[in-house]
């Protein structure tokens, strides 16, 4: 029997790593390391971490909670009902939905796709917020945080674009269902990548996600339902 040389190397790889002092990082360990890099001291909190968007969020907000939880650990949560387009995207991509936020007290909160207090679940307190990722510009209604937190606001078309770019920087390959859903979020939020609401970063992220999800550019508008504006 002829053995492929790569097969022999694959069997020897664990021993090579052990002898060289290298250790393979588990998925949860990688999430913890990335959370520490992103949040700093706030990552050391022993409270459970929930990623949540505005009440009854858009597809971008709901799916961004899934992306943030995948990158940094914690639970993707939702306050209110998923919109029909969001449900359609998740079903099309075979991606599970965020969990309903039954209890927020005692949790650390990461906000995605929102940073104004008036848009939040009233149970969310400013003292709970440890991070904000949003594509909306800062305004007079922005949540007043009691202490320094990680805030990533970029004037792009979608929050999912920001998180996809973070995944690129971290070297994280999103699972195919999540990549598909993230693509749907960007297409949905930008109304089909319309020039008026789409940046070059949105197009770059959409192209990468489409390749990962196996969706052709010409299929985008027929694949994902758009939110009514």
Model regions and ranges:
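Bacterial N-terminal signal peptides that target proteins for export
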Residues: 2-10
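Generic low-complexity segments that are intrinsically disordered, proline-rich and/or Lys/Arg-biased
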Residues: 5-6, 15, 37
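Extreme N-termini of proteins with methionine-enriched Sec-type signal peptides or N-terminal signal-anchor
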Residues: 1-2, 39
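Bacterial N-terminal signal peptides
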Residues: 11-20
């Amino acid at each position: 029997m002829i053995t492929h040389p790569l097969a022999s190397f694959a069997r020897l790889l664990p021993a090579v790593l052990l002898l060289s002092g290298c250790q393979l990082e588990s998925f949860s360990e990688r999430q913890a390391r990335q959370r520490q890099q992103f949040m700093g001291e706030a990552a050391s909190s022993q409270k459970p971490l929930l990623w949540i968007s505005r009440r009854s969020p858009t597809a971008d907000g709901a799916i961004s909670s899934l992306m943030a939880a995948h990158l940094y650990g914690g639970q993707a949560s939702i306050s209110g009902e998923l919109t029909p387009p969001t449900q359609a995207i998740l079903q099309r991509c075979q991606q599970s939905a965020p969990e309903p936020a039954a209890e927020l007290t005692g949790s650390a909160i990461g906000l995605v796709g929102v940073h104004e207090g008036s848009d939040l679940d009233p149970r969310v307190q400013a003292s709970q917020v440890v991070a904000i990722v949003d594509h909306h510009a800062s305004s007079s209604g922005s949540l007043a945080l009691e202490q320094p937190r990680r805030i990533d606001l970029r004037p792009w078309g979608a929050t999912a674009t920001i998180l996809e770019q973070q995944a690129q920087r971290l070297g994280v390959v999103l699972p195919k269902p999540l990549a598909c859903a993230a693509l749907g979020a960007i297409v949905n939020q930008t109304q089909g990548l319309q020039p008026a609401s789409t940046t070059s970063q949105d197009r770059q992220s959409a192209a990468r996600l489409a390749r990962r999800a196996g969706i052709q550019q010409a299929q985008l508008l027929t694949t994902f339902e758009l939110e009514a504006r």
